[in-house]
Amino acid sequence: MLTIFAVSDSIGETAQQVAMAAASQFKDNAEVKRIPYVKSLEDVEDLIKTIEDCEACMIVSTIITVNVREYLTQKCIEKNINIINVLGPIINVASTILNKYPDYNPGAMWNTDETYYKRIEAMEFAMQYDDSKDYRGLKNADVVLVGLSRTSKTPLCMYLANKGIKAINIPLVPEVGVPEELYEIDKKKIFGLTINPLQLIEIRKRRLDKFHRISADIEYASDSRILEEFEFADKILRKIGCRTIDVTQRAIEDTALIIMEKLGVK
């Protein structure tokens, strides 16, 4: 198992995303651990002590502060630890093109401006109205996701929220139906999530295996149950008249990009 340490002198989200993108190419053979706020030489020393005995590891660093970044690189060379400095080369090239000295301001991307507060508000909105907890959020949502269970509605809502988009999701369950409010809002902001039946069966079976569920939950992944749900979902989505997105073998980021493009959001 390879451990990728995402190291930053700020919150570490950028380093973590880069590390996770790399780790995802190796499925269960790589994990990511985020280590934020490495702001001093002492912090670097503590970091090295923590990871130097790791048999298979590497560092993905987005440290901005020059002396801290260089010291970390030096210590990694001494300890034979692989390190990738993600931002250093990019900043150097940008500096050359612009003929301007960089600010070297850790966390500048996450300054508490209007965009930051919009993201926080959207994330709180997504958690409050997740999985039909409260339908009152429908009219205030920027995006409404409608789909069967295990079509990535919740993680997609959270991803969109991180972009400052208020998203709410409505599960399609034959025994429950959908709220009438769904037919009263602008259908341009509603997106139906569809998926290949075989993939959905596989996803649900894996979930049952993970939690060792039996009895009533067996129906959850049965062919007949999923066929019933697909027929119900098709009926509802046709009635709404909304746009649909096939999420089969599609990454959450790709689905989010499609939605953002449809909404005209960059």
Swiss-Prot record:
Q: Output the superkingdom of the source species.
A: Bacteria
Q: Which UniProt keywords apply?
A: Kinase, Nucleotide-binding, Serine/threonine-protein kinase, Transferase
Q: Does the keyword Protein biosynthesis apply?
A: no
InterPro entries for this protein: Kinase-pyrophosphorylase (IPR005177), PPDK_reg (IPR026565)
GO molecular function list: ADP binding; ATP binding; phosphotransferase activity, phosphate group as acceptor; protein serine/threonine kinase activity
Q: Which reaction does it catalyse?
A: N(tele)-phospho-L-histidyl/L-threonyl-[pyruvate, phosphate dikinase] + ADP = N(tele)-phospho-L-histidyl/O-phospho-L-threonyl-[pyruvate, phosphate dikinase] + AMP + H(+); N(tele)-phospho-L-histidyl/O-phospho-L-threonyl-[pyruvate, phosphate dikinase] + phosphate + H(+) = N(tele)-phospho-L-histidyl/L-threonyl-[pyruvate, phosphate dikinase] + diphosphate
UniProt-listed PANTHER family:
PYRUVATE, PHOSPHATE DIKINASE REGULATORY PROTEIN 1, CHLOROPLASTIC
Q: Which family, according to the similarity comment?
A: Belongs to the pyruvate, phosphate/water dikinase regulatory protein family. PDRP subfamily.
Q: What is this protein called?
A: Putative pyruvate, phosphate dikinase regulatory protein
